[in-house]
Curated annotation (Swiss-Prot):
GO terms for cellular component: cytoplasm. The lineage of its organism: Eukaryota, Viridiplantae, Streptophyta, Embryophyta, Tracheophyta. SUPFAM superfamilies: HIT-like. A motif (Histidine triad motif) lies at residues 112-116. This is 14 kDa zinc-binding protein. Gene3D superfamilies: HIT-like.
Amino acid sequence: MSSEKEAALRRLDDSPTIFDKIIKKEIPSTVVYEDEKVLAFRDINPQAPTHILIIPKVKDGLTGLAKAEERHIEILGYLLYVAKVVAKQEGLEDGYRVVINDGPSGCQSVYHIHVHLLGGRQMNWPPG
């Protein structure tokens, strides 16, 4: 089993995450967008010249995409809309990639749903 998957398996519960601390401003982050529903900030380990994480401010049991329920439809759509807004703000007119890693095999590292916005270079396919 890969070390990434082992690390993910240790964090499967709904306990507070580093993102909760970022939302509460208990630890620093480079915020690029914020409103009453979401927070977007630069990834501390970027995988592209532009790598931004977009998270809902209220987790509401939405630790990952597999946990989504009908009540989460609005926030899931809003996360994608904000990805578009931030991409434009970041000057990614030529294109960008939006990623949601889900679960241990999907290499999800923080169990608070989040969207990765990647751009600023040519994205390759397949991704991984």
